[in-house]
Amino acid sequence: MSAELESIDHELEESIASLRKAGVRITPQRQAIMRYLISSHSHPTADEIYQALSPKFPNISVATIYNNLRVFKDIGIVKELTYGDSSSRFDFNTHNHYHIICEKCGKIVDFHYPQLDEVEQLAQHVTDFDVTHHRMEIYGVCKECKEEGN
């Protein structure tokens, strides 16, 4: 088994443990949604998850996807990313990280820059706010769109 598959399986097990601890029943659909989120690096929408899973789960609905994503979000194992186009995207990676977003195709890529972790502490110190979190996005054009000449 590849290291990536082992990592996905490990993260899935941890997520299932978090769901069980919260009293959430583990269903095949729930596991499939969670596995898709863990293995996807594209920050999918609920519709994208539905399109990917509906061939294997013909009885699954978009409402089921949204309901499960809400449960995952409430427990803290998924982040909802909202943007101006009114379509929420979902991110399994809930650790502090940032996003760079392609202005042409909408692709979102995670990146982490440790020095930015100090921003919250500095903001709290300078403003005397109780800082709870922050969000930073960088916009540009991805490699694929540059190559296509979009």
Curated annotation (Swiss-Prot):
Residues 1-84 are annotated as: DNA-binding. One of its GO terms (cellular component) is cytoplasm. It is found in: Cytoplasm. SUPFAM superfamilies: Winged helix' DNA-binding domain. Pfam families: FUR. GO terms for molecular function: DNA-binding transcription factor activity; transcription cis-regulatory region binding; zinc ion binding. It comes from the Bacteria. Zn(2+) binds at C102, C105, C142, C145. Belongs to the Fur family. This is Peroxide-responsive repressor PerR. The gene is perR.
